[in-house]
């Protein structure tokens, strides 16, 4: 009887221990993985682009604290490699883009495998000298064509109010002083591109030294083949002076983090 009782006790202890281990394992698996956003920028570029990037780092660090994701930044573009990008859900390019073949290849691989990207202003700059056809297609087949000068505020029209990116901005809002880029061809005709915000035609002509006289000038769009958003804003120290535009930046980041592809 004593042996039988002992076996029963041992069996009970084993079952309890197994249940405890399973419970701990399930609890660990149930914990949500903290998402990580990594911002790239350069300090050796145009001063107004550096100012924007430094302000953006502070802005998105504050957004991270509010929304509970990890945020880090780097000025070393060699961090654009598979090892460093492992576990990163979203990349930000604040004022430039990669230049070396290895950096570009790492970014292409990251995006083709479902990575996320949000680029600002000069991060989308490309022309015939850039020599990166993949990136032109990534932006929707569009190439930088010109800009206004000096930086000026502009009225923006929201093309899609149903998007999670634009849900907290009005149909029309004033954006702080910025250097606005023109694109040729416009990315809009591309069936894979979703234009979210456009420079309002009531702004034309905009500029003094260099002028945008008219035309279709998208300023925020996504290539739906990827988890990405391009924003033309990003020149100077006034970009974060608009609460409406700040909500746009915050919601765009959240939207990209929550998308799956």
Roles of regions detected by a PLM:
Residues 15-25:
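Bacterial N-terminal signal peptides
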Residues 145-225:
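Catalytic beta-strand/loop cores that center a nucleophilic Ser/Cys/Thr
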Residues 2-17:
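Bacterial N-terminal signal peptides that target proteins for export
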Residues 31-41, 51, 59-62, 66-69, ...:
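Extracellular ligand-binding/catalytic regions of CAZymes and related secreted enzymes
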Residues 55, 59, 102, 106, ...:
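Extracytoplasmic/secreted proteins, especially bacterial periplasmic and envelope-associated proteins
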């Amino acid at each position: 009887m004593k042996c039988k009782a002992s076996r029963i006790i041992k069996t009970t202890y084993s079952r309890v221990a197994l249940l405890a281990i399973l419970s701990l394992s399930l609890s660990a698996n149930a914990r949500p993985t903290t998402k990580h956003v990594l911002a790239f920028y350069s300090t050796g570029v145009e001063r107004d682009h550096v100012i924007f990037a430094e302000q953006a780092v502070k802005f998105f660090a504050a957004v991270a604290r509010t929304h509970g994701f990890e945020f880090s930044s780097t000025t070393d573009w060699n961090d654009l490699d598979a090892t460093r990008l492992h576990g990163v859900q979203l990349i930000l390019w604040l004022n430039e883009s990669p230049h070396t073949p290895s950096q570009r290849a790492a970014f292409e691989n990251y995006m083709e495998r479902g990575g996320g990207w949000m680029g600002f202003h000069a991060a989308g700059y490309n022309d015939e000298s850039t020599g990166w056809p993949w990136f032109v297609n990534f932006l929707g087949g569009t190439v930088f064509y010109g800009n206004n000068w000096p930086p000026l505020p502009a009225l923006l029209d929201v093309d899609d109010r149903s998007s999670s990116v634009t849900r907290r901005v009005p149909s029309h809002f004033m954006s702080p002083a910025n250097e606005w880029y023109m694109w040729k061809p416009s990315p809009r005709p591309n069936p894979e591109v979703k234009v979210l915000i456009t420079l309002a035609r009531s702004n034309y002509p905009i500029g003094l030294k260099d002028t945008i006289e008219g035309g279709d000038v998208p300023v925020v769009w996504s290539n739906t083949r990827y988890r990405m958003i391009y924003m033309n804003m990003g020149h100077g120290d006034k970009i974060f002076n608009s609460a409406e535009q700040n909500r746009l930046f915050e919601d765009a980041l959240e939207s990209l983090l929550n998308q799956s592809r």
